Design a protein with these regions (language model features):
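Short strand-turn-strand beta-turns centered on an Asx-Gly dipeptide
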Residues: 212-215
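C-terminal region of N-terminal signal peptides and the immediate post-cleavage residues
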Residues: 19-31
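Short tryptophan-centered beta-strand motifs in secreted/extracellular beta-sheet-rich domains
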Residues: 131, 195-203, 208-210
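Secretory/extracellular carbohydrate-interaction modules
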Residues: 70-75, 79-85, 89-169
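Short, aromatic/His-centered strand-loop micro-motif at the edge of beta-sheets
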Residues: 174-198
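Ligand-recognition surfaces built from glycine- and aromatic
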Residues: 41, 126-128, 222-261
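N-terminal export leaders
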Residues: 3-7
Length: 261
């Protein structure tokens, strides 16, 4: 085991404990140091960071080498350690630089390999993203976790996205097919704004298992996705846009782990 931390009509929901058996964390609220940058509290050696600044269509990206460790990167506007609770904090405004295939700004981590190359894993095996977080503010909708399509075809869509809305509703969006633009939204919970909660996204063969606060839901991944490799993303990927730089989505993480087996 190495640590770096869909669509189906039928689904099942079962109770699971806390983060579940695979929900190990590399930091907890009790151990977070508010005086360290995020890389001092979290293992960011296997993540790069996309920011809502840069040139049009090319947001600034911070490498794992710059993020990791007690001397790691911090940004007082978009990516910092909360001085009160030590959380890794992401802010994505409504107006900001976006990637070529999106109209929304983000302050978001992208999974990488330990050697610095982009993570790009097959559906075979057991792949898990676990987090404890809380959404502090959001205008309309924010994606706080993703399973994104990598190589294997022309599509750049996500396989699945986890959304949080201002009323506390949490939705899991599953892509209908690699080439279709539509998602199917599944309501999977409700947590009031500002309250901590946990999620685990586990990809295991042709299944994707999603656990929120201990309740697990399983979806079958359509075979059309089999040629594609995947990678995880986590942070604040705002899902609304305007000319405002003061409105947006602020998300705080208290633990974040990636695990592959």
């Amino acid at each position: 085991m190495r640590r770096r931390t869909l669509l189906a009509v039928a689904l099942s929901a079962t109770a699971a404990g806390a983060l579940g058996a695979v929900g190990m964390t590399n930091a907890s609220a009790a151990t977070l140091d508010p005086n360290l940058p995020p890389g001092g509290n979290f293992d960011l050696s296997v993540w790069s960071l996309q920011l809502p600044v840069g040139s049009p269509g090319s947001p600034e990206t911070i490498s794992p080498a710059r993020l990791k460790g007690a001397g790691g990167y911090t940004n007082p506007t978009f990516f910092w350690t909360d001085k009160n609770d030590g959380s890794m904090t992401f802010w994505a405004p409504e107006k900001g630089v976006t990637t070529p295939n999106s109209k929304y700004a983000r302050s978001e981590l992208r999974e990488m390999n330990a050697n610095g190359s982009a993570a790009n894993w097959t559906l075979a095996g057991n792949h898990t993203l676990s987090a404890q977080l809380r959404v502090v503010s959001v205008t309309k909708n924010v994606a706080v976790g993703q399973v994104k399509l990598g190589t294997g075809g022309s599509s750049t869509k996500p396989l699945a996205e986890l959304y949080y809305r201002p009323n506390g509703d949490i939705y899991f969006g599953t892509q209908n097919s690699p080439d279709a633009s539509g998602q199917t939204l599944h309501k999977v919970g409700n947590v009031p704004l500002g309250v901590k909660w946990t999620y685990v996204i586990n990809v295991n063969g042709n299944k994707i298992n999603f656990t929120i606060n201990g309740t697990k839901t399983t979806y079958t991944i359509p075979s059309a996705f089999n040629p594609y490799r995947q990678y995880f993303k986590a942070g604040s990927y705002n899902q609304s846009s305007s000319e405002s730089t003061s409105n947006g989505a602020k998300v705080k993480f208290y633990s974040l782990t990636v695990q592959h087996a």
